[in-house]
Swiss-Prot record:
This is Non-specific lipid-transfer protein. GO terms for molecular function: lipid binding. The keyword Phosphoprotein does not apply. Signal peptide: none annotated. Belongs to the plant LTP family. Keywords: Allergen, Lipid-binding, Transport.
C-alpha cells in the first residue's frame, strides 16, 4: 500500500482514495 495524494482524508498515508 502506497500513500500518495489522499482525497477524503486530511492525513497522508492513509489510503482512502489514492490518486497517485
Amino acid at each position: 500500500i502506497t500513500c500518495g495524494q489522499v482525497t477524503g482524508s486530511l492525513a497522508p498515508x492513509i489510503p482512502f482514495l489514492r490518486t497517485g
